[in-house]
Amino acid sequence: MILLIDNYDSFTYNLYQAVGVLTKDITVARNDEITIDEIEKMSPAAIIISPGPGYPKDAGISEEVIKTFSGRIPILGVCLGHQAIAEAFGGKIVHAKQQLHGKQTDINLNTANPLFSGLKSTIKAARYHSLVVDSISLPTCLSVIATDDKAQIMAIRHREHPTYGVQFHPESVLTGEVGNMIIENFLNDIAGIKTTKTKSAALPDSERVELKKYLKIVCDGKSLTEDEAYKAMDIIMSDRASNAQIACLLTALRMKGETIDEITGFAKVMREKMSKVNVKGTLD
């Protein structure tokens, strides 16, 4: 079982969906609705600590989880979770050189590290943050395994424990298939969890052509039928459309206004492809 600590962030469920493609045994717990003793009894095979608002020291049980289970259970921290790992081991969190919210930038990877196995040395990834791990005060027990073009820390690992953090968002559509590969690497190669999906290279954008006919309809100011909307969303959710095509479709829909038939067609696919979430505690 994989335990996903929710730091009250909508990206938690993007992470859940990304992990759910690989394994169905996931439990989500809010950072103030679970205890260390309860986690001990659950005996998870891996722990993922989600993004969230604010500073990691204010993220409920997150840092205590890292201090208690690092070295015993594989841990992956994303964004705030990544910062929590650094702070838990004595690092400092500082303001980034620029705020990035919903921006895609180049990330330089140490591909010798198992978290980035099979990836190119530079990828494009989604960033949503105004804080970063301070490189000057980084504890010696942690090493940097990714940076951005300003030499800011984008990923870390513990030198002796299977504990990893990424500042960027592997679960975001802006990161795409490489993000899924990072999550798969963590589960397969680091946590030793047998997943249900085998690693595969991303479909080249040149072969992602199915969405184009629906994109043309909307860009011409016309509306999709319910069936057309269903097929378009199925293409998107099956990872057969490029990020540029998806962005163009969403922009065109926004400009002309979505119809009831379009919303109904989209919703049908989402319901069919949704994953059920095991949540410990309350759900707002």
Predicted features along the sequence, with ranges:
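Glycine-rich nucleophile elbow surrounding the catalytic serine of serine-hydrolase chemistry
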Residues: C79, Q83-E87
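Amide-donor transfer/coupling interface in amidating biosynthetic enzymes
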Residues: I2-L4, Y8-F11, Q17, V21-L22, ...
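Residue-level signal for inorganic ion chemistry
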Residues: I47, C79, L249
